[in-house]
């Protein structure tokens, strides 16, 4: 995850990259957010889930109030095929999408490129749904 974080940060200097966080033994994640989502108090998290051995991308809010507002907004606008979360204790996402199931850690370069591509695509679709132009 540390190498992935560094790779994404170097390849996408217009994104704000957060520190690497280790969850409750079940996940590891870091924020990777463009300014046009950050200004809306939203963030993108690149998440590795240990038990299913998969990578996901989550759209989250800066707090529970923001999260609830955007879950409501996306429930009315649609999610572009992404999984919409429900407001409930312990749920930290607004939208979730799988990036890689059973990732091939024997080919880290390809895995990082695949994850980058899917994260950027997800960000662009979210921005489109929200009706903004992506600043790149």
Q: Which stretches of residues belong to each language-model region?
A:
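Contiguous interface-forming segments/domains that mediate binding rather than catalysis
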Residues: 13-14, 52, 89, 116-117, ...
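An amphipathic alpha-helical core segment
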Residues: 71-105
